[in-house]
């Protein structure tokens, strides 16, 4: 699941529970369209990619470098040989904004049907996630409290 800085879901992919998240990161980043605040077509790439330690892979960092995205991913705490050159910088204040996606997942799981996974088929579960994300977008853009 990918969301913007306001917690609005942009796109998602369904995968098996045993599948690693890093395998689905690049296809998810390729299909995203970020709506722009002005007129014109939506952007295809984000400025920052905030992710947890599970996404710490060299091929994802190279992908971010190729498309001029700044990865804000903490390094895994495993024994690793230091690479030559400058070490990658880690922006801790920016990384604290990652709680936005965690709050969005918490909000999504408040929907009982999604949290308990009542649906047997992936197609019907994906439809319920799409419906919940649509409701989230509509509440954000058309709230009565504004």
How would you describe each model-predicted region?
Residues 128-146:
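Charged phosphate-binding loop/patch that engages nucleotide di/tri-phosphates or the phosphate backbone
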Residues 25, 52, 131:
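Residue-level signal for inorganic ion chemistry
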Residues 13-38:
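Active-site beta-loop-alpha junctions of metal-dependent nucleic acid enzymes
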Residues 4:
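Short, acidic, Ser/Thr-enriched surface-loop or helix-capping motifs
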Residues 121-125, 129:
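Membrane-interface transmembrane-helix boundary segments in multi-pass integral membrane proteins
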Residues 36-121:
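Helix-centered, glycine/charged polyanion-binding patches within enzymatic domains
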